[in-house]
Amino acid sequence: RDSSSSDASTRLLKEIGVDIFSLNDVDEIDFYIDGADEISNDLSLIKGGGGAHTNEKIIASASKNFLCIADESKMVDELGRFPIPVEVLSQARSFVARKLMALGGTPRLRHGFLTDQGNEILDLSGIRVDDPISLEMEINSIPGVVDNGIFGLRKADQIFIG
């Protein structure tokens, strides 16, 4: 049995006959396999270029093993060259943007895009990610933030570069 982190992936998998289950139907997942936008040496990640990072983080957190597959261009010494996606409630977008600017970053609305949960994404650039766990928690503590694309608390267990 398989699960998917986005509505688009679920549709594609069902088209080829893969039986998809809900995370609500299982206690845990043995393996979660996905890519990343950036990977640091300590296996922290930035994910969410496709806008599904909240669901991806939920599934990764419910998985015994999180395997990340990427090409060498995704490996970085320090996270933050790729914008950090921040999923926000629409009514809090401007408030969250001001708070992100106070952290030293530049948020930009991902125009014309809504997440599978119907929320907006602010792509945050220009901010140093010296401590992925602290920044992940600091961004998530802003009222109106659903989640962000830093995977510091739930890092990948293994990286496969190909």
Predicted regions and their residues:
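Divalent-metal-activated hydrolytic enzyme cores
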Residues: S6-D7
